[in-house]
Amino acid sequence: MKLFPRSILITLVLSFALNLGIVTKIHAKDTLDSIVDILSGLTCETQGVGDLLRTEFSHTCIVAPFFTFAVMNLVSPVLYMNTFLKLKINDSDLFNDSNFGNFPGGQCTRENRIDPKNPELRFALCNNAKLIVSRAKSVAESALAIAKAVLTGSDPWDDIKTAWANKKKEYHVPYSGKPGDDGFAFDLGFPVIYWKVIQDKDRICVSTKGFTGDVPVGCKYMKEPFPKSMYNSFMDVADKDFIEDPNKTPTDPLALVSCSAAGDGCYQKAYNASKTAVVMTSPLIECMRQMIARLLISKDVCSFDNVSQVVNLVSRQDSVFFQFQVGMYKIVTAFLTLYVMFFGFKLLLAGEVPPKSEYINFILKMIFVTYFSIGINITPGNGSPYDRLDGMIQWAFPFLLDGINGLASWVMNAAPSGLCKFNNLSYDGTVSYIALWDALDCRVAHYLGLDILSTLLVENAYRSHDFLNFDFFSFSAPPYIYLLIPAIISGNMMLVSLALSYPLLVISVAAFMVNATIMCMISIVILGILAPLFVPMFLFAYTRNYFESWVKLMISFLLQPMVVVTFMITMFSVYDYGFYGKCQYKSKLIHNSIEDKIQGGITSKRDVLIFYINNDWDDTSQYPDKDAVESCQNSLGYMLNNPITTVFNFTKDSVSEIVGSKPGSTPTDKFLAKFQFLSGVVLGPGMFFMSPKVLFEKIKNILLALVMACFTLYLMYNFSSQLAEFAADMTEGVALNNVAIKPQAIFKAAMAVLATAGAATKGGDQIASRGGVGDLKAGQGGGASDLEVGKGGLPNDNIAASGGTSAPAVTTPTASSSVASSSPKTVSSEARSDVVTPPAPTEAVSPPPASIRTSISTLAPRVGKIIRDNNQESKKEIDNTPPSQEKVDNAAPQEKVDSTSKGTGVIDYSFNLKEHDNPTGVKQIRENAEIRDKRVKVEKAWNELVARGGGRVREQEGGEISERRANAEKAWDELVKSGVVTEKKDNSSNENS
């Protein structure tokens, strides 16, 4: 009120009253408009409200629904409204000169749209301080006009109207900016306006800050054809300067979207963005993220960063989440209606006015449930389901899915040695999450020795090194390789298993981390899709437990990967300290990866970050004291990776001590005791024997490191079995045991494969170590010679087959003069000799007193022999009385010569059944049947062996005995011992030279 004194106000009122009665109708109308203009122009805010009510929108060139302003005020409270009322873009009174910008006809005409070559937006902001000065000047001029009218009696209205004429340029501040430019507008009162120029597709907008980021306030279109849209990668517009890459003009319609098959695909995108030498896991995660984006948003987007491109388009109808939301519209509306009804009943029945906090909670619950379940419709009266603000798509899903990688990457980069530390700021914003998976791939490759070549090249070609220290020989070979090489050479599978235990555990834990992360992402997606079902349950106390359980599961799946990464970092840190001491790592960025060099560098050129041990011992930032340097130099990993450097440094230090010191008055023994090298070669007691001290100390350090590594491996192996349950208990969620592969399962499977390979190798060594003789030499000769056999003078044919063996000698049992007994029948045949027993020199067999003539026909040695039993033709006389001597003699089975056997090479002979003392005929028949079954089984095994070997199962050089032949021989011996077969084995064979 100090700027508007009471006298001035009285003067204004009197002037209006005096002129109100004397002006014409036209003056009356002009006076009314002037009063409204004056009242609406007292401040920038009131002027903005007046422009909004009486004219078209002055803050933007693009008309928006009025309800949009209310929604934007919720997203950006105070800031949006303050900027909205002061911003001027569509005002022809301002933008008509060089200071504000000369736009004939106004900024918003088609001819005055923004030039894509120079995307500069002109706008102005009202300033209350300048407005007060302008209004004070108008008041002073009006007072002078009234005073003049009083003194002269003239009409003051024209002068007053001139004093209050439009002077917008006096209290508006002009601004201009291109996308990315920002600044502050200072004015009286609060808040200070923050503005930023942004580009939204084919629009350039002035924005301010809000909860969701930059909130556009006023916008202006760019000229057509718009070249910077998502079609820029393929659209062939007239002006080639507008296209980023003129050579890239594909015609495939699928190229309309960046994640289509016409592009590089998810694997290539992740591979090109990765900065590790060996890429393993990041393509898998990228493909999973793209699949989730397509499933939840639209098939036309690959990332949640592109939500704004399709949030109001029909393409969202392909989204599973959108379809479920549409189906839940009526149900969520019913929940909200019931909530409003219950709240109204509560107010009516309470009998008193509830506190304001209860009203606020009521409104916030309504907004929360609508925003996160089905979305807020930002266009009143528009029934389109696409034009909505969706909290799950725009906020919840990006936060949860990005949070999985963000939280885990914080822990992954906390390694004390600096190994595999990737900064996500060095990545593009859309793929910054790959830093976590690059760190995982880098560590797995480092512990498995997959990056030996990369590190070796960096050591030689990319870093400034001192060749006096033999740095060119250093490489990052993991210690287990030095144990694996002799284990493989010696064939000791126990050493191989011990050497591979740690890399297998690393692989199993890394695989579990990838598996757990993917399962958590899928679980979050499933729970998120069900958000329209669970979020409305927050309204009522009876169903709120379901909502809280839903939220707990979401948070649990967000945190579980971080717990797994913490376990991995702990395991890796203990391993690093055990094998590498306090060694610190440095990194070098290579602009051409090794893979690209191998491929000729045609496909892509990506940056690769290589890590190697920092051997600059004077670097106090990483090695603050001498203990840290000695801890690294004496570590097992450093000595194995840098053997020549270790020997060279030790020799150099020892020689420098000797050369740099001169003997003085001190005794010789004390003088020599000062040198580490000389004192180190003195023999001293070791653990089991006398050894040089230096050698003993090194061996002791190596053994202690191995023991600690084994102990660490044991602890981590047992803890990994409970890792899933531990992560679930930490986050109060569901364990991933049943959906993710446990680390122990992978470890046990790999160790089982090693055990199987070891057993196979051991069995092969045992077979190879057995001795034997070669095949029998084939005899030559030809005809048959008859030999007299037995008392009866019956001849036995002995036929020498070509390339063959000795003819079998067959004896048949005869009865003695007093007791019925059976004499052994000896068969010395090629089939029996080759199948059952190893070849041996032939022994003569004495025939029994009584024998029958057996005819044996043979073919070529390659023809299989079939042993046929003709014992069925022989019959026993079964009687209840003991058999007489004559019956026993006649009961002896006779071997008959089959006419077909002579022409087919069939060997016919018979077996004796076991003689029984039991006179009962039924029991005799049963026992004979059992004996016959056993005999058939043995003969079948022989026939298979003979047929398989073509008449002879040949032995390998070195005397290898087949397992099947050994089994057949064992079965035959059991039958002989049991009396089923009374034939004695003849292992003899003739060898003709």
Curated annotation (Swiss-Prot):
It is found in: Cell membrane. Its main location: membrane. It is a multi-pass membrane protein. Residues 838-850 have a biased composition (Pro residues). Keywords: Cell membrane, Membrane, Signal, Transmembrane, Transmembrane helix. One of its GO terms (biological process) is protein secretion by the type IV secretion system. This is Uncharacterized protein RC0142.
